[in-house]
Swiss-Prot record:
It is found in: Membrane. The gene is Tm2d3. This is TM2 domain-containing protein 3. It is a multi-pass membrane protein. Keywords: Glycoprotein, Membrane, Signal, Transmembrane, Transmembrane helix.
Length: 261
């Protein structure tokens, strides 16, 4: 019985040895495979391939680009005065550019070639889009226009009731629909002419009825003279009569130097 079991043990021992050798072979083979697969990975790490470059835009160029985009989207200030799809010949002067000639004869009718400014749209008599057209006007500079064709600033610091009559320098601007030569804004020396809201009829009525109490002088803002008339009972009537005449002819006016309404 033991003799029969001895060959069986030898076979088992041999099978274990073969199994051990096969495992070693497999492990050695896997190691070679891992080595072979690891080589491309190591090569890929050493050679990452083509690199992607990124360009950095300078701050100045970025600001310039942003300002250009902002300017392209901004609405020009003159567009607030320019009607859309109106007649080109009736556009305000701020909406067009004309090739004027200052050598024309003063007071004579002249024609000039004009072009609408960018972003302005207008049409001709046939309602067709137009950019170039001709305008008719009178040959004269803007400061030679009638007073009804321009607006001037007022001064509230000069005295209107003065002898000689005072003047002041005003800044005048031509109205939008008026065409002329030269600058549309110009200085001009004007007579002092402004009002503070005082009525001549009210001052005269107070002088006749309540002049003895100085009501007319108080109304005109002359409180010192008003107190003098109040405590002297109108100068015993003489001062009252004199004030009626002075206010009636316009010699006595408001204390702030303005004109009557």
């Amino acid at each position: 019985m033991e003799a029969a079991a001895e060959p069986l043990r030898s076979v088992r021992h041999l099978s274990r040895v073969l199994l051990f050798l096969s495992q070693c072979y497999i492990l050695s083979g896997d190691g070679s495979l891992n080595l072979e697969h690891s080589q491309p990975l190591a090569q890929a790490i050493k050679d990452p391939g083509p690199t992607r470059t990124f360009s950095v835009v300078p701050r100045a160029a970025e600001n310039q680009l942003f300002s250009h985009l902002t300017e392209s989207t901004e609405i020009p200030p003159y567009m607030t005065k320019c009607p859309s799809n109106g007649l080109c010949s009736r556009l305000p002067a701020d909406c067009i550019e004309c090739a004027t000639n200052v050598s024309c004869t003063y007071g004579k009718p002249v024609t000039f070639d004009c072009t609408v400014k960018p972003s302005v749209t207008c049409v001709d008599q046939d309602l067709k889009p137009q950019r170039n057209f001709v305008i008719n006007m009178t040959c004269r500079f803007c400061w030679q226009l009638p007073e009804t064709d321009y607006e001037c600033s007022n001064s509230t610091t000069c005295m209107t009731v003065a002898c000689p009559r005072q003047r002041y320098f005003a800044n005048c601007t031509v109205r939008d629909h008026i065409h002329c030569l030269g600058n549309r804004t110009f200085p001009k020396l004007l007579y002092c002419n402004w009002t503070g809201g005082y009525k001549w009829s009210t001052a005269l009525a107070l002088s006749i009825t309540l002049g003895g109490f100085g009501a007319d002088r108080f109304y005109l803002g002359q409180w010192r003279e008003g107190l003098g008339k109040l405590f002297s009972f109108g100068g015993l009537g003489i001062w009252t009569l004199i004030d009626v005449l002075l206010i009636g002819v316009g010699y006595v006016g408001p204390a702030d130097g303005s004109l009557y309404i």
